[in-house]
Amino acid sequence: MKETHRKYPYPRRRLIRSACQLLAHAAFAALADLRIIGQENLPSGGPLMVVANHFSFVDPAAMVRAVPWPIEFIGGFQMPNAPPAVTWIPKVWGYYPVHRGTFSTDALRAAEAVLEQDGVLGIFPEAGNWATVLRPGRPGAAFLAVRTGVQILPLGFAHLNDIFPKLREGKRARVTIRIGKPFGPFHAKGRGRARRPELEAIGHEIMGHIAELIPPEKRGHYSDDPAIRAAAEGTEIYPWDENPEA
């Protein structure tokens, strides 16, 4: 067994994650009117990278609800947009933290090890939920796609931000999860700086697949409507470029 597989085993926390999956099913049934579209697109298993838009702190739970596997996440070390009452949930599930604004070598090694073990990796390419329209992805998802050569499964989440406002009105929000067809693998010929344009193009292709699965008015930088693209200007600014997570 490779040393990285010992350090980053897949699957892990099986009992805890099975319980959390049941909790996610129950929570969405109680709190929202949920539709999942495209379940016929689910492959038989890994290695697989699952990607989705990231507009809400509820998104990781929605990904757990949408797919049948014990998904492994890499995600932000801090959770600035999540209510303090729910920040314990990702810690119980367990994930490999990324210190945003840094290269986060350890998290990338963990992600590679998970995929080498035919695992399923969840990642939100936008690397944060500070906006409610689609933004260009950060380099991490494209880098892992090229590095591992695995297929990618796109998900599109709609109206998750409505869940708690609707509950305060005594109503259940109508939430949709769309599952797209797997795509990839990707390869890049260049090395170092010469590879950057290829990775950027792959990143845009990944986001384009996600854009097809969300409402047109939420497609932001990937909209066909110039007015929507113009309104999204500025959302691509990454808050951690100047202030990396410690």
List the predicted regions and their residue ranges:
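Non-catalytic C-terminal accessory region of glycerolipid acyltransferases
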Residues: M1-I16, D106-A246
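Conserved beta-strand scaffold positions in the cores of enzyme catalytic domains, especially
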Residues: I36, F73, Y95-P97, I152-P154, ...
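A transmembrane-helix-recognition feature enriched in membrane-embedded lipid enzymes
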Residues: K2-N41, P83-W93
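Catalytic core of membrane glycerolipid acyltransferases/transacylases, capturing the structured
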Residues: S44-T102, A110
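Short, basic, glycine/proline-bearing loop/turn elements
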Residues: L23-A24, V92-V98, F124-N129
